[in-house]
Amino acid sequence: MSVIDKTSSAVNPLREKVTTACAKKLYNDKDCIKIADFITPLVEDMNLDSNVDRKLHNKLERYELRLNKEYLSEFEKINNIVQKFDELCVKMNSTCTNLSKQMETVKFKSVDLVQKTASLKEKKASIESRCNMINEFLENYSLSSEELRELDECEQSGHLSEFFFKVLERCHEIRENCRNMVQEQGHLAAFEVMEKMQKIDERSHAIICNNLKREFQNLTVDSHQKKQILSKAFKIISQNDAVFQLAIDQYISSRSQELLNQFVEINKMAVQMPEGLAEPLKAVGDMLTSIHELTEQEKQLFSSICSAENLPIVLDECLKSLTSPFKIRVEQLLSTEKNAITIFKMGNILIFYANKFETLIRKDSYFTIMLADLVKTVRQVCIAGINHHVDGLMRKMTSPHYDLLPVPEVRQCLSLYHGLISIAVKTGDLNLLLEPERIYEYVLEPLIQTVQLSATRLKSDIEVSVFTINCLTVIRSAISEISAFKKKIEMIDAMIEGNSDVLVSVQVSEMLEKSGILELYQKFNAVNPAEKKPLSTLPGLESTTVGEAIVMFTQYLHNHASSDHTYDIDQQILASEERQRIRERNTLEFLKVYKMIVDRLGNPTNGYENLHYLPIEHVESVLKFEKEKENTPSSNESESLA
């Protein structure tokens, strides 16, 4: 066993443990036995007993020595490593010292850097906040790329879409919000955005104006999608007066041409129909009906896309294109029409539609003014036609016929009057081309004058009166239903009354002469009321003379009662009522004369006591019986003549 100095043992505790283990009796030590069991595999055929203790001890010493050598070798290596490590530690110490100094330096720098970093973080947070605010502002107060692209596409394609108007609504919303921000906060960015939105708005207005004319073409009441787009377009551009007026002008131009084309097509179809333009009245009515329908459609169409306050002006301007073609067409039709009644109807149609268009458009529109001018023209043509027709009839009027009835020209003139006045009656209280008074003035006044002039060709006053009464009676019957002609009827009645006076005077004189009492009446009437002598003593009024006259009167009355009066002049009077009135007047006047004679005969002072004469009541009853007997056949005859 090698000698190991105490210093080494003290230094190496492992060696001390090995030495202690070798000094013990290993076979009695339980721990050693465990170790022996552990190292037994290392020794072949060796049993742990007292005999082998020495051998084992030697072997262990050798093993220990070898281990010590190995330990020494390894320890030298470790020592070398430790020495190197020590050198490294020295170097590391130096390095750490340097690092410590540098760290102190860096520490001061880091503190400054941290302070700067904190400041930068604050600035970064502020910048990020501002950036977020800017991004949020730009997001809320600017148009997206898609929206800007939509504006470009609409500008290039020329078609407006729903999305286009959504973009414009957003543009207006942004501009209004920016305006509020500028007014309330003085926001400069909002002012710039507002100016930008203003430019976009102006650009969009230009796009709308450039595309409206295309949208207006082929626009109908059923074009619902187009109407929605145009309604939004007008709503947007209404804020810009100049652009809005330009759009209105474009609408008027486009729709005027469209209305003109439709009007031309309607006229082409009317010309191609079998009757063509052979019926001017129907042609004018159809044209006005078509124009009224087109105007109604145009009114409905414009009301659906724009405000109603511009409607009258727009309709007026749109219909302006139809005024000249319609006026020319009506004047052409008017130039070919000669019938005054048809012209009168045409004028009333024009007046009727003029009133309708005043309500539909406005009072002083181009179309209503044109219709008013046409009405004046038609009125002049109608008056000229009536005058020409009446003058022609008056020139052709022949002398009265033997029956003293109205000549055919009178009937034709009254037919013209009936045609005109019936239209006036049907029209009622509406405006007329000619009022009933004017119709009377242009038709019946010349007729009455010509009738009076034509009657002068007759030989006797009775024939003149009968013919005049017949004509005036027919005229009065024609105007009797018109309340406006009350004074005219009174005037005609006065003229009939005047001619009836002549007729009654002549007839009564003739009856008195035929009855034989005319001379007696004249003599009685010629006696001076102051005469005191009896009338029977006067020459020509003797009882015998008066008696003969009374007998002659009685015979006349008998013959008169039995006569059918076929050849009486009053039988030629057309109207049974007038004829009966004249007969009643004849009877009344005749009875007045006879009553005066009877009064003279019945006066005792006149000396006619023994003279027999018919009582007045008897004569009156005989004459009334005649009247009743003739009433029925006369009425039938009057109806047949009428």
UniProtKB/Swiss-Prot annotation:
<dbReference type="InterPro" id="IPR010490">
    <property type="entry name" value="COG6"/>
</dbReference>
<dbReference type="GO" id="GO:0017119">
    <property type="term" value="C:Golgi transport complex"/>
</dbReference>
<keyword id="KW-0333">Golgi apparatus</keyword>
<comment type="function">
    <text>Required for normal Golgi function.</text>
</comment>
<dbReference type="GO" id="GO:0015031">
    <property type="term" value="P:protein transport"/>
</dbReference>
<keyword id="KW-0472">Membrane</keyword>
<dbReference type="Pfam" id="PF06419">
    <property type="entry name" value="COG6_N"/>
</dbReference>
<dbReference type="GO" id="GO:0000139">
    <property type="term" value="C:Golgi membrane"/>
</dbReference>
<keyword id="KW-0653">Protein transport</keyword>
<dbReference type="GO" id="GO:0035262">
    <property type="term" value="P:gonad morphogenesis"/>
</dbReference>
<keyword id="KW-0813">Transport</keyword>
<dbReference type="Pfam" id="PF20653">
    <property type="entry name" value="COG6_C"/>
</dbReference>
<dbReference type="InterPro" id="IPR048369">
    <property type="entry name" value="COG6_C"/>
</dbReference>
<dbReference type="GO" id="GO:0006891">
    <property type="term" value="P:intra-Golgi vesicle-mediated transport"/>
</dbReference>
<comment type="similarity">
    <text>Belongs to the COG6 family.</text>
</comment>
<protein>
    <recommendedName>
        <fullName>Conserved oligomeric Golgi complex subunit 6</fullName>
    </recommendedName>
</protein>
<dbReference type="GO" id="GO:0030334">
    <property type="term" value="P:regulation of cell migration"/>
</dbReference>
<dbReference type="InterPro" id="IPR048368">
    <property type="entry name" value="COG6_N"/>
</dbReference>
<comment type="subunit">
    <text>Component of the conserved oligomeric Golgi complex which is composed of eight different subunits and is required for normal Golgi morphology and localization.</text>
</comment>
